Amino acid sequence: MEPDSHERIISATRAMSAGAERIFDLIADPSAQPSWDGNNNLASAAPGQRVRQVGDVFKTTLTGGMVRENHVVEFIEGSKIAWCPAEPGKQPPGHLWRWQLEPINSTLTNVTHTYDWTALTDSKRLDKARSTTPEMLRESMDRLAMLAQASGG
């Protein structure tokens, strides 16, 4: 039985004791992503790939050694970024990672992390998509918050 579309969108929200600019910089810099990845899925990403706009593509290496090209599909500096991962040279198979930041004040930010696989049709990826939980998203958020707070927020 296929899940309903609402079951294919998983999200978690939390407040972080850091400014939105600092948090966003850690998300938009792919080389920082492995340090806060709560899924333990990312091994590395080369420096110098800071996302600046929709259409950018950044590469990450997964813990299993595979490379992913991440196609940026939503971008508002400091407040929203989303990308669709794909195998090199291929079209994204239909899942998306999104981060949205809402400043509460200069040192407190509400952050929402979403995994959306409503458009995923690749049967080889469905089990992995189904296994992604809000707790996994929260783990990434907790690690990101620690890094942002430690660096002066």
Predicted regions: what they are:
Residues 116-153:
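A conserved amphipathic terminal alpha-helix motif
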Residues 34-35, 61-110, 116-118, 146:
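Hydrophobic-ligand binding "helix-grip"
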Residues 14, 112-113:
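Short, hydrophobic/aromatic-enriched beta-strand segments in well-ordered soluble domains
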Residues 1-15, 94, 104, 135-138, ...:
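Hydrophobic-ligand-binding modules of eukaryotic lipid transfer/binding families
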Residues 1-49:
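Hydrophobic ligand-binding cavity/cleft-lining segments
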